[in-house]
């Protein structure tokens, strides 16, 4: 893929739309991938006029502080709209009997986001630690169902945070996936190679954006430099994508964050910018997302037969919508949105926060135990 094509602006994704045994497993000279744009540096009004600020605000619902460093979304005061939303996206806990009925004679496969799903949303991403109780619940789920975590974080980082060898891990929004070697043959894809994990076991490593690693590293370093004077801004490198967090930035400085990221990314036409929960994500322009990652994992793990398996994806972020959409449109499973704030989604069910996710997972384990005991006789 030729990264140096004759374009001078990045792809800006969805700027105005408010709203998805071990399995784990050198930079080029600065400027190589940069495009020398001759366009005049835009004024600050650009990010206001093109919808960026609207997108930043819509992806950042109001919150209230509970305890130090932890936040929880505030549900709207309009009880009617809240009830109407819950009718459209009923609680996965109170609807569990219906979920169990859908899973009759099928094997469930569980896919989980990390931040905001298994761990609370916190001011400092480095402190997004899942509780021991949540880790135990996920570990129990993996005893009965194939379980994977698909996170926007790097695969190594999310494995470090979760620390369970029973799971499958996909990082960078699914652009870095490690799975066991399929005895019936590995996917015939140039982006899929055989390697060994941390325990020395042979695994398949799928990285559809591996050629972008140098440019992501370059952009990360540049974004750190150009945002270092903005109090509260934090830039993270997730190997195949990078993120600029503005959760701790004074709202009056949001336009400055947006403008600096926007201006810099004009030099990289093969990168796009998307909006998450108080974060700007920079990622390669490739046809890959969490939905594609779910499909890849189902195929790689031999779980793609709709008549035999029921995939469930639990997530809280806009990026999880791609996975929800794949399951909904393929009539092969369903998504569960983690949110206490009404918003449109491709999910079928909802949970308010990570504490309800834990409760749902425990309920799923109880059901799994019961079903397992039936088949043992």
Curated annotation (Swiss-Prot):
Pathway: Glycan biosynthesis; trehalose biosynthesis. It comes from the Eukaryota. Disulfide bonds: none annotated. The keyword Hydrolase applies. GO terms for molecular function: trehalose-phosphatase activity. Residues 1-20 are annotated as: Disordered. Its EC number is 3.1.3.12. Its cofactor is a divalent metal cation. Induction: By trehalose. NCBIfam families: HAD-SF-IIB (TIGR01484), T6PP (TIGR00685). This is Probable trehalose-phosphate phosphatase G.
């Amino acid at each position: 893929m030729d990264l140096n094509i004759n374009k001078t602006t990045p792809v800006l994704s969805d700027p105005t739309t408010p709203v998805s045994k071990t399995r784990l497993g050198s930079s080029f000279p600065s400027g190589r991938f940069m495009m020398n744009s001759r366009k005049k540096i835009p004024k600050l009004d650009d990010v206001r006029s093109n919808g960026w600020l609207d997108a930043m605000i819509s992806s950042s619902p109001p919150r209230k502080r509970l305890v130090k460093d932890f936040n929880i979304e505030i549900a709207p005061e309009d009880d009617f709209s809240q009830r109407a939303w819950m009718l459209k996206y009923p609680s996965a806990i109170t609807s569990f009997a219906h979920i169990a009925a859908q899973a009759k004679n099928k094997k469930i496969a569980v896919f989980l986001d990390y931040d905001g799903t298994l761990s609370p949303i916190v001011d400092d991403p480095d402190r997004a630690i899942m509780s021991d109780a949540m880790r135990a619940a996920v570990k129990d789920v993996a005893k009965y169902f194939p379980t994977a975590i698909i996170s926007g974080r790097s695969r190594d980082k999310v494995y470090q945070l979760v620390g369970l060898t029973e799971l499958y891990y996909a990082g960078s929004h699914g652009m870095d996936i490690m799975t066991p070697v399929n005895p019936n043959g590995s996917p015939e894809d140039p982006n899929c190679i055989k390697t060994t994990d941390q325990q020395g076991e042979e695994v398949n490593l799928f990285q559809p954006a591996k050629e972008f690693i140098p440019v992501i590293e370059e952009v990360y370093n540049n974004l750190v430099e150009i945002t270092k004077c903005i109090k509260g801004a934090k830039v993270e490198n997730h190997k195949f994508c990078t993120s600029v967090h503005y959760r701790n930035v004074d709202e009056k400085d949001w336009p400055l964050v947006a403008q600096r990221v926007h201006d810099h990314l004009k030099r990289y036409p093969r990168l796009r910018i998307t909006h998450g929960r108080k974060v700007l994500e920079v990622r390669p322009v490739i046809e890959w997302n969490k939905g594609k990652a779910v499909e890849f994992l189902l195929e790689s793990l031999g779980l793609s037969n709709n008549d035999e398996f029921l995939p469930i994806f639990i997530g809280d972020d806009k990026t999880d919508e791609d996975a929800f959409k794949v399951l909904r449109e393929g009539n092969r499973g369903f998504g569960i949105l983690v949110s206490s704030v009404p918003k449109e989604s491709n999910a079928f069910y909802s949970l308010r926060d990570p504490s309800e996710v834990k409760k749902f997972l425990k309920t799923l384990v109880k059901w799994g135990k019961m079903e397992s005991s039936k088949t043992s006789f």
